[in-house]
Amino acid sequence: MKFKKNDEVIVIAGKDKGTVGRIEKILVKENKVIIKDVNMVTKHNKPSQQNQEGNLTSVEAPIHVSNVAYLVKKASKSSAAVYSKLGRVTNKDGKKVRLVKKTKKEIQ
């Protein structure tokens, strides 16, 4: 998985296209990420003995990593947001580092 927790990303496909957020959780086996306040779905909770009335809660649903890109620069009044896919490369020290493909810069 090329993304890490707390990376700032932009959604590039789906109903929340163009939305910017931070990664809260990574689901490695499913190849999905959960982004704060993005892809909200309504969950119906059944009534139980502790909770006599059922209720509706909003929860973030996972998004596939192919629909998310790393945010390089936020949008401003004069320019659009710059985003790119991530890659991995081995640097001179022999360590694997994450690389922004568009700008060819390493990130931590």
From Swiss-Prot:
Disulfide bonds, paired cysteine numbers: none
PROSITE patterns (UniProt xref): RIBOSOMAL_L24
GO MF annotation terms: rRNA binding; structural constituent of ribosome
Record's keyword terms, sorted: Ribonucleoprotein, Ribosomal protein, RNA-binding, rRNA-binding
GO cellular component: a single term: ribosome
Gene3D superfamilies: 2.30.30.30
Keyword RNA-binding: yes
UniProt xrefs under SUPFAM superfamilies: Translation proteins SH3-like domain (SSF50104)
Domain of life: Bacteria
An example Gene Ontology biological process: translation
Pfam family, one: KOW
HAMAP family found in the cross-reference section: Ribosomal_uL24_B
Quaternary structure and interacting proteins, as annotated: Part of the 50S ribosomal subunit.
Family classification: Belongs to the universal ribosomal protein uL24 family.
The protein's role, per its UniProt record: One of two assembly initiator proteins, it binds directly to the 5'-end of the 23S rRNA, where it nucleates assembly of the 50S subunit. One of the proteins that surrounds the polypeptide exit tunnel on the outside of the subunit.
Protein name, entry field: Large ribosomal subunit protein uL24
Gene: rplX
